[in-house]
Amino acid sequence: MAASGNKIIIIAAPSGAGKTSIVKRLLDHMPDQLAFSVSCTTRSPRPGETNGVEYYFTTAEDFEKKIANGELAEWEMVYFGKYYGTPVSELERIWKLGKTPLLDIDVKGGLKVRNRFPDSSLALFIEPPSLEELSRRLHARGTETPESLDARLNKASYEMSFKTEFDRIVLNTDLDQACAETEQLIRNFLQA
């Protein structure tokens, strides 16, 4: 699927580690090189999210058709029976623009993409300073029930065990520093 020279940047992390904040900064700093790869999901939109911008929001039935038709580069059932996936059409759309897809993705999905495109991807794991800080960040969002917060923290602990399978680990204790480190890693990869 990836033609010679087509690269992919994977930013993965437990929920609340700061990957989306880092991705937004990267897109602001590198608009000529990177384009956001819009994933599809069966979860409901959060306040302020727009279909086709943050995600393509779809039904479970439609998502399962995409799986059956081979339309997804990767997919996972992530939280509480909600699907997330990367449409092949998104990667192709971005490559046609002459840019590199930037994936804001969960840990298992990130590893699937990395394993599917081992020679053309850079997989970065954004590590939170601690599970306590991660809990504070998730609670501050105001979108979690006590049950979903516990589930996300348990999943985060599990996901942290996969961090060494990524090309690089970026510790996000300070957002500006983490963004600068991530941007430099990407610039080096794209120039190689």
Predicted regions and their residues:
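NTP-dependent small-molecule kinase module
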Residues: 2, 136-144, 158-192
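Walker A (P-loop) phosphate-binding loop of P-loop NTPases
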Residues: 16
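Conserved lysine of the Walker
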Residues: 19
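Post-Walker A alpha-helix
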Residues: 22-24
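Post-Walker A helix-loop "phosphate-sensing" segment adjacent to the P-loop in P-loop NTPases
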Residues: 28-36
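Conserved phosphate-donor/acceptor-positioning beta-strand/loop module used by diverse small-molecule
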Residues: 101-106, 117-140
